[in-house]
Design a protein with these regions (language model features):
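Conserved SAM/SAH cofactor-binding pocket of Class I
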Residues: 110-207
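Flexible, glycine-/basic-rich loop-and-beta segments that form/coincide
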Residues: 286-288
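Conserved Class I SAM-dependent methyltransferase catalytic core
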Residues: 100, 227-284
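Short helix-capping segments at alpha-helix termini
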Residues: 34, 148-150, 171-176, 242-243, ...
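Non-catalytic accessory regions of SAM-dependent methyltransferases
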Residues: 1-49, 54, 64
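Short amphipathic alpha-helical segments
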Residues: 167-168, 208-212, 236, 262-264
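Conserved AdoMet
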Residues: 46-121
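Mobile active-site "lid"/loop adjacent to the S-adenosyl-L-methionine
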Residues: 200-231
Length: 288
């Protein structure tokens, strides 16, 4: 890293073209075992220049300003430490839309889109109220509102910092009808909901984590006791009071945890309906 820092100090003193910077940055990212090295270097420079990636491809001989080089290399240094790219550029795509993110929230994952897929498959026309528990950046609540505009969506999170990010995203996407409420799971609920969405922390703290990027994400949003199932189990119990009869519960968890979640859910009149990747859906049985 000392050799790299010396190289960067030298490079900022000399004019550098787009192509030259991208090649050098991608090489450094490869040495740091970042598989998407070329893509990441392009996204970082696109962010600094406020230009789309295709502009970089067409203007490879353009010379970077000194301040642009300095900013790009500062971001590159952080990426070499495996800080998530989304935190560096301040946004991440989810379900075809761009969302603001910060270190206060998890970086949206592609597998979480499976929850939206199950929601759209399973929701019934009479089901009109949705709550997203542990909303984080608001991706599930906002996407649900955009895909199901006939529904009323509430979003709960214990973190005021996360709620601030979620509200920014709601404003960005014009979904100001979503209600954002600070709450520990469903503690603040005032009504029964037809649908409960919950991407809660489910990582067992004892698991070996190969992904160094998660070290930069909030532990509060990743880890849970009881082999990762503590918060999910608490929510299952809360559905007795706050999930409407015949209501729909959609969770995310590691597939290795699904069988235990399904077994625990039966104690709360929840019947497993369907799983898709990391997502699993339950229906609440009607009382006799």
């Amino acid at each position: 890293m000392l050799q790299y820092n010396a190289l960067m100090r030298h490079s900022t003193s000399l004019p550098t073209s787009v192509d030259t910077w991208l090649a050098a940055a991608a090489a450094q990212l490869r040495t740091a075992d970042i598989a998407s090295s070329r893509l990441d270097s392009e996204l970082l420079l696109s962010y600094v220049l406020q230009r789309p990636r295709h502009w970089l491809h067409a203007h490879g001989d353009s010379t970077l300003l000194h301040e642009q080089q300095v900013q790009a290399e500062q971001l590159l240094t952080r990426r070499l430490q495996h800080e998530p790219l989304a935190y560096l550029v301040g946004h991440k795509e989810f379900y075809g839309r761009d969302f603001v993110v910060s270190p206060a929230v998890l970086v949206p994952r592609p597998e979480t889109e499976q929850m939206i897929s199950l929601l759209l498959q399973l929701i019934q026309p009479t089901q009109r109220t949705i709550v997203d528990v542990g909303t984080g950046s608001g991706i599930l609540a906002i996407t649900a509102q955009l895909e199901l505009p006939q529904c009323q969506v509430d979003a709960y999170d214990i973190s005021p910092e996360a709620l601030a990010i979620a509200q920014r995203n709601a404003q960005q996407h014009g979904t100001t009808s979503v209600n954002f409420i600070q709450s520990d799971l469903l503690a603040a609920a005032q009504q029964r909901y037809d649908v409960v969405l919950a991407n809660l922390p489910y990582v067992n703290p004892t698991w070996q984590r190969d992904d160094r990027e998660t070290a930069h994400e909030p532990a509060l949003a990743l880890f849970a006791k009881d082999d990762g199932l503590a918060l999910i189990s608490t929510l299952l119990a809360q559905t007795e009071q706050w999930l409407a009869p015949s209501g729909l519960l959609i969770l995310e968890a590691d597939p290795c945890q699904h069988s235990r979640i399904i077994a625990r859910a039966t104690a709360y009149q929840l019947t497993h309906m369907q799983s898709e990747g990391y997502a699993l859906a339950f229906a609440k049985q009607c009382s006799a």
